[in-house]
Amino acid sequence: MIDCIYNSDSIFEIKKLDSNSIHAIISDIPYGIDYDDWDILHSNTNSALGGTSSAQHKTSLFKRRGKPLNGWSEADKKRPQEYQEWVESWSNEWFRVLKSGSSVFVFAGRQFAHRVVVAFENSGFTFKDMLSWEKDKAPHRAQRISCVFERRGDIANTNKWVGWRVANLRPLFEPILWFQKPYKTGSTLADNLIKHEVGAWNENSLTHWNIQQGALNHSNILKVRITSEDKGYHVAQKPLNLMKLLIDLVTKEEQIVLDPFAGSGTTLLAAKELNRHFIGYEKNNGIYNIAVNRLGIEKNNCFYNKEKK
């Protein structure tokens, strides 16, 4: 049923969707970077990624984060491959349900974005582009290594390493991976547009939703701010207008947008407000209820018979 969000795991439930029935998939998938419990896709965990500090202990985000058992050591070398295998466990189904020429936008962590690309290419997709969503601010902690030596009483190394830090730079951009399901050999893009009405992009969406785009800019760098109305729904919340930009970029009214990792329903709400149909999945009960309330839909109208595997 369209215009619904289902309280279930899309990895299994998406198999119930018809082949070649979806016009676009837009999803903020788990990044596999230990952001929260739902983002830890390996068994090798401990506490805060990149070491801990008193500042981190005061911040709820860093209290939640998992850490590879040995930090960023050789013990973590299997994690990228494990993440790629997890993506490949569902990307084939994404390919199946999409119409030829349809677009997929996937928000991916910088650390493992390349593994998402490989997984999707292995599933048949064409990697079209990598967009950049630029943010005004982002949570960030990079521990001063001199402080570590100072706590050890190692004055020589404290002085030697003043100004040096561990962990990453402040993450002020997020990659948005753009994939496309290729049209059939022997056809043309124009023929595919006539048949499936997907495969091109709408330049007006860039100037309408993006605060930095000029009429002829057509840049793959997107600047969409998070507003007060975007906050408080999910720890990894994306701006509603950013999702509207992506939906408006590759779909037309009355077409179907799918979000298999729907979270608090931002993609689905954007689709609804743009007069697109939507289908979403969210297995976390609490977050699912938030999405239902935002969408203003009745749960009973979106009942999915889970016995039909």
Curated annotation (Swiss-Prot):
Gene Ontology molecular function: DNA binding; N-methyltransferase activity; site-specific DNA-methyltransferase (adenine-specific) activity
Instruction: Spell out the reaction equation it catalyses.
Output: a 2'-deoxyadenosine in DNA + S-adenosyl-L-methionine = an N(6)-methyl-2'-deoxyadenosine in DNA + S-adenosyl-L-homocysteine + H(+)
The source's domain of life comes to Bacteria
Query: Single Gene Ontology BP term?
Result: methylation
List the keywords (alphabetical): DNA-binding, Methyltransferase, Restriction system, S-adenosyl-L-methionine, Transferase
Q: Which Pfam families match?
A: N6_N4_Mtase (PF01555)
Query: What InterPro entries does its record include?
Result: DNA_methylase_N4/N6, RM_Methyltransferase, SAM-dependent_MTases_sf
Q: Does the keyword Transferase apply?
A: yes
Give the EC number(s) listed in the UniProt record.
2.1.1.72
- Which family does the record claim for this protein? Belongs to the N(4)/N(6)-methyltransferase family.
> What protein name applies here?
Type II methyltransferase M.HindIII
Organism, by scientific name, is Haemophilus influenzae (strain ATCC 51907 / DSM 11121 / KW20 / Rd)
Q: What is the lineage of its organism?
A: Bacteria, Pseudomonadati, Pseudomonadota, Gammaproteobacteria, Pasteurellales
Q: What gene is this protein translated from?
A: hindIIIM
